[in-house]
C-alpha cells in the first residue's frame, strides 16, 4: 500500500519535557486523520515536525516516500498546506497579495486562479481588501486560502476553527 505519510518511532523532547515518545503511524492516500488529546500531549509538535518546522529528537518520517531531511525540506514543504490556529498573514497586504506572497515563499510562479482560491475559502470579492480589515473568521479563511496555494497534496489543519 502507498502511504502519504509514514512516521517511524519519532520522539521529540524539549529540555526536560518529552512531547512525543516513539510514535509510529502510516497514513494512506485519501485518509482523514484527527489527533485528539489534552493540551501538551504533542499534537501540535507532531504537526510542526511533519511540516518541517522542527526536527525530531529521534526517529524519522517521510511524505510520499521522501524522507524529511534538511536537503528535502523545501520539496516536502511544497506538498503540504497547513492551517494553524493563528494563521501567518500579512495584515498590511491585501488578500491577493498574501496569496501571491505564499507562492513566492514556495518558489512557485504566481497562479492566475487566485480569485478561485479565495472563492473556495469563502472570501469572494475580497482580493483587493487589506487583511487588517478582516474579521477573525475572515482571517482564518485567508489562512485556509494560503494553505491551498500551490495545490498541496497534503493538508494539515491545526485547530483551524
Per-region residue spans from a language model:
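Hydrophobic anchor residue at the start of the ABC signature
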Residues: 144
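Conserved ABC transporter NBD signature motif
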Residues: 59-69, 75-76
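Catalytic Walker B motif of ABC-type/P-loop ATPase nucleotide-binding domains
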Residues: 155-159
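Conserved ABC ATPase "signature" region
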Residues: 100, 104, 111-126
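Helix-to-loop junction immediately C-terminal to a conserved catalytic motif
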Residues: 51
